[in-house]
Design a protein with these regions (language model features):
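Nucleotide/phosphate-binding catalytic cleft detector across ATP-hydrolyzing
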Residues: 1-165, 173-291, 297-366
Length: 366
């Protein structure tokens, strides 16, 4: 019911919305406008009053800096909802922000989910969205949405491989003729990169750093493949021996060591999917290359590592972070196009049938 109050009052009929409900961030796509919301999946709540103090960017700034009665919550873990009530309240905020003060028609809403999601989890997402007032609900697997957003024509009889590395999951899939041929969902992704960096700093330097600091290291000097020109960065944390603040300089070589385990797991999973891919589609992938999407794909050298392990050209999609959200919204248009093609095909088939048989078919349909 949390979305019903919004959709029921502002939507009529006809618009299309795509929502990428990710572990690390939420993106909302509106047809004709593009991505209108792009914010972290974070909420800060006052535990004493159960009041939301901030959502998204503002809440993210509070991580690690709040007093005891205020908690910063990330309500999604490993691609699925871990705190349903907080997720509802977060979604309400983002949808209101996307819609603004201008009413739009009652929408068709597409929501992307990890390829490993259970039927129960999928049904919960669909029911919540439909109760919110959606005219129609489409549930899309993240690799399919990522492929569409990356500009791949998924309707062709040709194999395409997509590796979508989000915050909580890495989805790897081979897609052909509009569907997934073989896929896997790995619970190793961007959040695990951060955790690996935190663990490394604690073990090697006796330094405790927070999520924000780990993410900054990952973005600025993180690496999955040896750099030709090493880089470094100063970081501050708490010395676990003295308990006092301490500054140190961290190098990209250290980041290569810290991140070796999670990036190797992803590269091995890609190799494993290729081994399960039918020969004809594997040949297509060898010719066309592997496409990487999601924020995690931007880790320096990860594309090179996968290319080295698979011996297949690996490329990062343009605007990799937005691919899933763009594809989620555009899937609605894709589905409508497929329906039109199907209708035209049925019409051609009917036109080739004698008129007396056509009448019999129509009467049975009626």
């Amino acid at each position: 019911m949390f979305l019903e109050k919004i959709f029921g009052s502002v939507f009529g009929f006809g618009e299309s919305i795509g929502i990428d409900l990710g572990t690390a961030s939420v993106l909302v796509y509106i047809k004709g406008k593009g991505i209108v919301v792009r914010e972290p999946s974070v909420v800060t709540i006052d535990k004493n009053t159960d009041t939301i103090l901030a959502v998204g960017n503002e809440a993210r700034e509070m991580i690690g800096k709040t007093p005891g009665n205020i908690v910063a919550i990330r309500p999604l873990r490993e691609g699925v909802i871990s705190d349903y009530e907080t997720t509802e309240r977060m979604l309400k905020y983002f949808i209101q922000k996307a819609v603004g003060s201008h009413p739009i028609a009652k929408p068709t809403i597409a929501v992307c989910v990890p390829s490993s999601i259970t039927e129960v989890e999928k049904r919960a997402v669909e029911d919540a969205t439909r109760q919110a007032g959606a005219r129609k609900v489409l549930i899309i697997e993240e690799p399919v949405a990522a492929a569409i957003g990356a500009g791949i024509d998924i309707g062709k009889a040709c194999g395409s491989m997509v590796v979508d590395i989000g915050g909580g999951t890495t989805d790897i899939a081979v897609i052909s003729l509009g569907g997934t041929v073989v896929s896997t969902s790995l619970k190793v992704a961007g959040d695990n990169f951060d955790e690996a960096i935190i663990k490394h700093m604690r073990k090697k330097h006796n330094l405790l750093i927070g999520e924000r600091s780990a993410e900054n290291l990952k973005i600025n000097i993180g690496t999955a493949y040896a750099r030709t020109m090493p880089v470094s960065m100063d970081i501050r944390g708490r010395n676990l021996i003295t308990g006092l603040p301490r500054n140190i300089t961290v190098t990209s070589e250290e980041m290569l060591e810290a991140l070796s385990e999670p990036v190797s797991m992803i590269a091995d999973a890609v190799h494993g999917i290729l081994e399960k891919t039918p020969p004809e589609l594997a040949a297509d992938i060898s010719d066309r290359g592997i496409v990487m999407t999601g924020g995690g794909s931007l880790l320096y050298g990860l594309d090179k590592l996968i290319a080295e392990r698979t011996h297949i050209n690996t490329m990062i999609a343009e605007d990799a972070i937005s691919c899933v959200a763009l594809g989620t919204g555009k899937y609605i248009e894709y589905e409508e196009r497929m329906k039109r093609i199907g209708a035209k095909r049925r019409e051609r088939e009917m036109n080739s049938v004698p008129s007396d048989i056509q009448e019999g078919v129509r009467s049975r349909q009626e």
